[in-house]
């Protein structure tokens, strides 16, 4: 009873299902037969097919000859290996699935297996047979040797000419120091005859020595007298190099210019002194004092002035010397010692002194200094009338 009740319930259920799907069912037997056939087909399909979860693409060589490693398609709905043999990828459509068994690109293609080509005969290079570097080395070596030879030659020539130049400088120094005997005697005579009466005053000897050292840079005594020589002996002048100026000519030009300066200073001194002597002889004196420059003198030369009578005017002669005259310090400091008439008488007076030696003592120098006449300009005012009978008040 129970089994029959179950079967009836089952059939009723099937009938209801068939009506809901709109399937025609003419009879219960036909419906039962149709339903039985459908159930059998569903059972066969469930047993033969399983759900697809992933697909694996094999590794292959692509069209460039590069190896692509294998990979698995299991991301989301992309579960199938699709594409071509040379390019593979994952897709979600089963009908686009690639049959990988038909592809042949799983091995290395023969065209990609290229070996190293054999070397050509033209590309072979033998360093031992190449002579280009050797030629370059030879040229550079020759140039370096020539440069060294030139440098050493120049150094040798300079060393060879150096002793000659030293000998020339020494010979020039000897020529300037040595003078002819005749010229030395003539200089002594001229200095003895034309010596000035004021050249023995040594009150300002220190200042005179400094001025003389600045003018000609010549040493005392014999060195100074030798520097006054106009030209050395022709036989003693060394032969200079043809391409450079002679040192002897330079020295001679230097001393000639210094000599001209000394002569000009002497002319200025004697011009002022002669003007004062003329005014004193006429009996008239200027309103203002006449400035007299220091008379050039040579403190190392012997003195031999000539004696003149009183009342006669002495002619002033020039002595080629670069030392200025040293006046006594009491010439202007004590103006009351001499009067105007004594000045007039003193200007025309010359004292004679014999030649002295260089070893004169200081006492003799003081006596000679006190014996020399002193220039004095009166401090009293007077007027110039150019008259012989002028009277000073």
Swiss-Prot record:
Annotated GO biological process: regulation of short-term neuronal synaptic plasticity
Segments on the Extracellular face: 21-131
Biased composition (Basic residues): 310-321
Chain positions covered by the region annotation Disordered: 28-52, 307-340
Keywords: Cell membrane, Cell projection, Glycoprotein, Membrane, Postsynaptic cell membrane, Signal, Synapse, Transmembrane, Transmembrane helix
Subcellular location per the Swiss-Prot or TrEMBL entry: Cell projection, Dendritic spine membrane; Synapse
Superkingdom of the organism of origin: Eukaryota
Signal peptide (UniProt feature, chain positions): 1-20
Transmembrane segment boundaries: 132-152
GO CC, alphabetical: AMPA glutamate receptor complex; dendritic spine membrane; ionotropic glutamate receptor complex; postsynaptic density; postsynaptic membrane; synapse
Residue ranges annotated as Cytoplasmic topological domain: 153-393
Residues carrying a glycan: 38
Function recorded in the entry: Regulator of short-term neuronal synaptic plasticity in the dentate gyrus. Associates with AMPA receptors (ionotropic glutamate receptors) in synaptic spines and promotes AMPA receptor desensitization at excitatory synapses.
Similarity comment: Belongs to the shisa family. SHISA9 subfamily.
Oligomeric form and interacting partners: Component of some AMPA receptors (ionotropic glutamate receptors) complex.
Name of the molecule in the record: Protein shisa-9B
């Amino acid at each position: 009873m129970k089994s029959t009740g179950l079967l009836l319930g089952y059939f009723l259920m099937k009938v209801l299902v068939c009506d809901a799907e709109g399937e025609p069912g003419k009879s219960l037997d036909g419906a039962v037969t149709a339903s039985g056939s459908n159930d059998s087909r569903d059972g066969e399909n469930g047993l033969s097919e399983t759900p697809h979860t992933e697909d694996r693409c094999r590794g292959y060589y692509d069209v460039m000859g590069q190896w692509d490693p294998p990979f698995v398609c299991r991301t989301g709905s992309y579960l199938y290996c699709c594409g071509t043999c040379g390019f593979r990828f994952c897709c979600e459509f089963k009908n686009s699935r690639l049959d990988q068994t038909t592809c042949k690109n799983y091995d290395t293609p023969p065209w990609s297996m290229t070996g190293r080509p054999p070397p050509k005969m033209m590309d072979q290079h033998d360093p031992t047979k190449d002579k280009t570097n050797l030629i370059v080395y030879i040229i550079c070596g020759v140039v370096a040797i020539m440069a060294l030879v030139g440098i050493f030659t120049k150094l040798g020539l300079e060393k060879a000419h150096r002793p000659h130049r030293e000998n020339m400088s020494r010979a020039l120094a000897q020529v300037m120091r040595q003078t002819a005997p005749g010229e030395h005697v003539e200089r002594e005579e001229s200095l003895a005859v034309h010596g000035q009466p004021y050249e023995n005053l040594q009150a300002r000897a220190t200042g005179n020595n400094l001025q003389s050292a600045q003018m000609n840079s010549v040493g005392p005594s014999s060195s100074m007298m030798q520097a006054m020589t106009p030209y050395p002996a022709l036989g003693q002048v060394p032969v200079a190099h043809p391409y450079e100026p002679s040192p002897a000519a330079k020295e001679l030009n230097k001393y000639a210019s210094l000599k001209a300066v000394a002569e000009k200073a002497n002319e200025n001194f004697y011009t002022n002194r002669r003007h004062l002597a003329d005014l004193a002889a006429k009996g008239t004196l200027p309103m203002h004092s006449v400035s007299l420059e220091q008379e050039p003198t040579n403190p190392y030369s012997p003195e031999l002035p000539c004696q003149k009578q009183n009342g006669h005017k002495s002619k002033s002669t020039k002595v080629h010397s670069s030392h200025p005259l040293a006046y006594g310090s009491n010439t202007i400091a004590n103006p009351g010692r001499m009067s105007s008439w004594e000045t007039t008488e003193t200007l025309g007076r010359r004292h004679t002194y014999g030649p002295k030696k260089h070893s004169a003592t200081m006492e003799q120098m003081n006596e000679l200094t006190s014996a020399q006449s002193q220039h004095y300009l009166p401090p009293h005012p007077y007027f110039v009338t150019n008259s012989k009978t002028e009277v000073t008040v």
